Amino acid sequence: MVRSMPLRGGRPQAPTAPTRWQLQNTVFAAESQNQPSASEAVVSSTRDAALQRRRALTTDGKAATLVQGSVGGGRVRSARDQRQPGWVRRDKGATSGVPFNLSRSSLPITNRQHPLTDTAANARLRAYEQEVKGRFDRIVPLLQRVSALQHEPDFIEQAQRLTRAELGFDLPQHILERAWVRPLDMRALFAWCVFESHRLFSDRFFQDDPLDGAAGSVAARDFEQFLLDCGIHLLDVSPCADGRLAHTVAYALRIPFSAVRRRSHAGAMFDVENTVNRWVKTEHRRHREGMPNPSTEPTRYLKVVTYHFSSLDPQHQGCAAHGSNDELAAAAGHQRLLDFREAVENSFCCGASVDLLLIGLDTDTDAIRVHPPSRDSEMVLDQWLCARELHAATASMTADQAMAQIAEAIEAGASGPMEPGMVAFLTRLIANNCSQIDYVQDLHGAPYPDAGHAERFIGVGIGFKEVHLRNLTYFAHLDTVEEGAPDLDVGVKIFKGLNVSRDLPIPVVVRFDYSGRVPGARERAIADCQRVNQAIADRYGELVNQGLLHTCLTVRDRNQTAPAEVVGSTLAPPLQEAH
C-alpha cells in the first residue's frame, strides 16, 4: 500500500480531507496576489507587535525585548511586564531546584467563588455524590449493628428491617438463616451490600440520568456541536485506572459523559492496537453514515491521556503504576500518544492522522494542568498551564475577562502556533475545571480528605459507563485476565491495603457490555463473564478460598438505556441437587 505523506510543514489529515498545509497554502496563494494597503500594513504590524509581547511573556525566565515599539498604540513592555506568568511552566533548566511537579502551588485556599463557576451544576453534582457514596459509607456501621443482633430470636426480621431502612435493599436470606449454627458470615454480607449498592446507583444512573449527560440530552448535543466547531469529530479520553480519576470526565472536566469515549487503564497506558481499531470504526462510520460528520470535513480524532499526581504527598500518593513518579507518568503517557499517532500514520494512506493532548490531574484538588499542543500536536513535557493558578489569577475578573485571559495564556504556553479550535477547546476545559476547583473547596473546605485510595470495589471487564465518582471504583478494563493482569494486580494490591488489612473482602464487579443488535451477543457476554470469573478464582485462589474476594457478574446492552443485569455471583445460594 502506498502511503500518502504530508508535505513539509503540514500535518496529515483525515483520509479524504485536504491537509491543513494545503488549505493554508491555498489561502496564502490567494492573498499574495493582492498587495496590502497602508491600513492593512498597520493592522499586520500591530498584530506582529502583539505576538512579540505575547512571546515576551513566555520566554524561559529571560526578559524578551521587542524588535520595535507597537504601532497600534501599545507600549514596549518593561522588565517588570516581561516576567513569565505564573501559570506558564517552562523547562527545568530555567527553574533550577524546583521539583518537576510545579503544579504543587502554595496558593492559599480562598473562599471566593470564581466568576466561571457553575454553582447550580456544583449543587446537583454534590447531591448525587453524597447520595451514592453515602450508601457505601453506611455499610460498615449497619453491619456492625446487624452483627450484634445475630443471637436475637427475631434476628432475621430485625436485620432485614434495618438494612431496608439504611441501604434500601434486603440481605441474602440464605446467609442470615445460617446464623444459628455458625457465626454470621460478615465478609459475605459486606460484599453483598457493596454489590447491591452498585446495582442501585447503576439502575438510577441509566433510568434518571442524574448527571444530565445521557445521549440526546441538551448538554450532550451542545457539547458535540462545540467539538465539531473546534474541528474535533471524536473525543477519546484514557485516564489512569486509579479510582481518584474515575470522575475525570463528568466532574473534573465537566464533559457530558455520552459525548466522550472513555476507557481507563493503569498508568493511562491504553492499548494502542485497540485504540487504532476504534479509530477505524469512527472513520468508517463517517464514510458510511456521515456521523458525527461527513469524512470530507477537515475535523480530527482527538486522543487524550490523563495522568495524575499528588500536590500534598507526591512521593507516596502519585500514580502507583509509575511508582509515584510524576515525570515518568507524564512521559509514559506522552509516548503512548506518539505511538498511537505513528500506528495510524503507518497503517493508513491519504494523510491519515490524529490530534493528541496530554492532561495532568492533581488528585488532591482536582486542578488540571494542560500541555498545550502546537498545530502539529507537539507538546513539551515540562511546559504546561496550571488551572489552579489561572483560577487564582482570574478570580477577580468578570467571566468574559477570565475567558479571554485563559485563552491568551493557552496560546502563550504552547511550543508553537496552535489551531484556533484547540485553543477554544482547552479554554473551555480550564473554565470548566474552575467549577470543580470551587466544588472541592466548598465541599471539603480544603483539599480532599482522602488523599490516597478509598475505592469501594474493583470493576473488571468492558463497560461501567455509570461510574463517574471519585474514589468509587478501580477500573481494570480487559477482555481476558491474562492480558489485563497488570491492571488487575494493581487493583488487588490496592484493596489488600483498603479491605483485606481490615479483614474485609475485595468486591469485584465483572461487566461485559454487548450489542443487542447482534444475534447471540448476550450469551457471549455471559460466557465472557464466567470465563473471567474463573480466571480470577484461579489467579487469586487463596483470597477466594478465605472468603476475601467475591465477584458479581453483570452484562448490559449498550444500545439501550436499561441498567446492567446480574447474571451470577459467588454469593448466590447453592443449588440443591435433585435425586
Curated annotation (Swiss-Prot):
Q: Taxonomy-wise, where does this protein's organism fall, top ranks first? A: Bacteria, Bacillati, Cyanobacteriota, Cyanophyceae, Synechococcales
The family assignment reads: Belongs to the beta-class carbonic anhydrase family. CsoSCA subfamily.
- Recorded E.C. number(s)? 4.2.1.1
Name the gene behind this protein.
csoS3
Provenance organism: Parasynechococcus marenigrum (strain WH8102)
Q: Where is the signal peptide?
A: none
Q: Which residues are recorded as binding Zn(2+)?
A: C240, H308, C319
- Induction entry: Carbonic anhydrase activity of nitrate- and urea-grown cells decreases with rising temperature (from 25 to 28 degrees Celsius, present versus predicted future ocean temperatures); there is probably more than one carbonic anhydrase in this cyanobacteria.
Q: How is its activity regulated?
A: Inhibited by dithiothreitol, partially inhibited by acetatzolamide and cyanide.
Q: Which cofactor does it need?
A: Zn(2+)
Q: Where in the cell is it found?
A: Carboxysome
Its recorded name reads Carboxysome shell carbonic anhydrase
- Annotated Gene Ontology cellular component terms: carboxysome
Subunit relationships: Homodimer.
